[in-house]
Amino acid sequence: MNKQNQLPLVGVRVADFGQQIAGPAVAMVLADLGATVVHIDPPGGPSWKHPANAILNRNKASLCIDLKTQAGLDQALELIENVDIVIESFRPGVMKRLGIDFVALRESRPELITLSMPGFASNDELHRDWKATEAIVAATSGTFTDMGFNRVLMGLNPSFSPLPLGSSYAISLAASSIALALFEREKTGRGDNIEVPIAAALMEGLSYNSYVVDQLPERYKTMRELEIEHRKSNNIKMDVSYAQLQEYLDPFYRTYVCADGRQFYCVCPSHRNHAERALKVLGIYDELVAEGLPEVKDLHVPISEWDGETSIGVYPLPKKWADLISEKMKKAFLQKTSDEWGVIFGEGQIPGAPHRSTEEWVNSEHCNASGLIVEVEGTEFGTMKQPGPIVWFENESEAMLKPKPQEHVSFEQALARLQSVAKIEKISRPTGQDIQPASGKGWLDGVKILDLTNVIAGPHSTAFMSRFGAEITKLDPVTPLYDPLIGILFTFQTGVGKQSALVNIMTKEGREVFERLVRSVDIVVINAPDRQMKPLGLDQDSLSAINPDVLFCRLDCFGGPRTGSKTNYIGYDDIIQANSGIMSRFGKPETPEEHAHLGTLDVNCGFAAALGMVIALYQKRKTGKVCRVRTSLSAVTNIAQIPFAFDYEGRAPFNEASGREAMGNHALSHFYRTNSGWVFLDSHQGELAKLDAIKGLNGIQQSQDMGQFLRDQLVKESSAYWLKEFAAADIACAEPFSIEYLREHNSRVADQKVGTDLGSYAFSIFPDHPSGHCITQVDPYSIRPREAKIRAVTPTEKFGCSTIKVLQGLGYSESDINDMLEKKIAATGWGREFLPS
């Protein structure tokens, strides 16, 4: 392995015209990875006035330029002439109207990579010109009306959350698109014009909120889902209290009060070993066995053929056993403090964690020791704790853990910095007349990946890469680790574009299959803690001995660039939501709630892992260096909480919008009833004069209680009226749509196309899905290059469907394959049915 310890994007130059969160954050990610970034603000400074700008603009040189003047435009164009990448996040067409035309720029400089990050897609005729703030995109995209089963049962619709999820997904997706374009440019010399709409990124990120499986068997429906169906069919009001709601939760997937009065989130459903370990450390396993706790040997046969009533490791459990186990677990958790249980679960390899606030998370020993939180010494805030990098490289991350504060420079200094970097760059790509014409191929055509991952985050990383042409072999064990809900139902999203093989790699023959696969691929990826690497033969020395050129990517739960006390703890999305403060903010510390449905952090962790893999591919193509890339759910939660995940001496209190009663950030950024429904107004004090000029809002500037004023006035007219009036005044406002509404109006039967031409929303219906069910899911459409191809990926195939094909491709004979199948070293399925009934 090349020991040269240089960040992979050293020499790459970026002009960052981004505002708000998403655009500047993409440039921040590139800067963290070594790129030289010049950030350009308008004369008044950043449009988002927030301490988090110190995070977004770290490792950057910043200056103000007035693009509305000829002198300012000339300066901007000169900076662009000296960079590889240009980033902007305005409404579609704004940069062109100011005199910066990305398409025209690439006609003279085809090597240039441009990234546009509008709130809504440029081909979305309805929404493209809206003032698309974070909350407006969220409201329009169904985020505030589909916030999980809890909120449905409590009758809370709409709900509000201050998490900038649209931007958080767009950061990983857009940074990945830049990395993909850089990788392609090393081969062809060509850049690309790329668009990543925040709304489309949000829809992909929250894909588990929107996918539908028709005629889903009852065994997969939770007690909450069944109660929702019951109330809807019998016209019963959704009015379940928080306390009542707890009794609809599975015992292995809920919050418990501990001896210190604080709460602990247990998340070990669907995995037989995790649930059993939990019951044993709680001291109630033997008691439950004595009371007749049933056991089902094979969960992948139809439920009508089970040899027992249920089994631990089944999610959801039937109510009878759920109630019995929950009562015993409640009493057991009261015997120790939440911190004590955190250590017991973590050291015992059981998923679970104490609920904590974001302030506690940012200042925790583990986050600071592991590099998940870093310290930046700046002039404005002094020593500021900030999120660490979202991707890093094993044994090479120290340079990423000491970010430099934002540096304010003159135009001349910024230009000189870019030119000095250009002078020493070692160019290895085609240039000038050698730049190749656009091929129309995928960025990852020919790249082969061995996917050893499970659940959501890991599999999502490679599913994401399949749209760009990557060839993915998904390798799973012959005996499944998870029940069919997590092990199969979730894979309808994460298994797309892959061939599936089942092999027991812990046997001698299976190990040989694994080694042949490693020799045949470019990347190996797994989600697992570091302690599992050597036993699995995935440590650096073992993998290099098999294939010295193979890249490696690992995702985990609590991992950071350095080792911390929780580095080897296992867990899921929900655990990091609980431990990092997301749940305490969403529901309040005393009544925490899961945020949205599934995959809120998982999916973004997958996107971040893909970013890391593509950066590794780029670095290898450019320098020949082979590396091991990392990310974690903990790193990703910090990006999702950029407005909150920081601290410094004198910081304002952590008192952001929180709880079920929160309907906005403040009176001018808030949900209000109209006489026909709801609207979300997202304004601020600087727009009071414009608000006062709107018919019906005259006098708001003099109001002593703006919230009450707006409640009184907005309810007098329809939502349509207010949307028209606010749009005319260029004030951000939107009607909250539901996911069902968006699906109904933006779905089509799968047509082998990607919905990049369909605006901000696109879903495909698969009536002939391999599962035998009709599936509707969001398109892989958020990344929209002008030249590279995005392909419509194949639906998830049945597990083991390609086992024989994969073994044949590795050179095994028919008799070899039959022998492995007979010995159960390999298998062609986990059960008769794809999704067991």
UniProtKB/Swiss-Prot annotation:
Phenotype caused by lack of the gene: Cells are unable to grow on dimethylsulfoniopropionate (DMSP) as sole carbon source.
One Pfam family hit: CoA_transf_3
GO MF term (any one): transferase activity
Catalytic residues in the record: D602 (nucleophile)
Job of this protein: Dimethyl sulfide (DMS)-producing enzyme. Acts both as a transferase and a lyase: uses acetyl-coenzyme A (acetyl-coA) and dimethylsulfoniopropionate (DMSP) as substrates to produce DMS, acetate and 3-hydroxypropionate-CoA (3HP-CoA). Mediates the CoA-transferase prior to lyase activity. DMS is the principal form by which sulfur is transported from oceans to the atmosphere and is a key component of the ocean sulfur cycle.
Family per record: Belongs to the CoA-transferase III family.
PANTHER family per UniProt: ALPHA-METHYLACYL-COA RACEMASE, SUCCINYL-COA--D-CITRAMALATE COA-TRANSFERASE
Protein name from the UniProt record: CoA-transferase/lyase DddD
Organism the protein comes from: Marinomonas sp. (strain MWYL1)
Source organism phylogeny: Bacteria, Pseudomonadati, Pseudomonadota, Gammaproteobacteria, Oceanospirillales
Gene: dddD
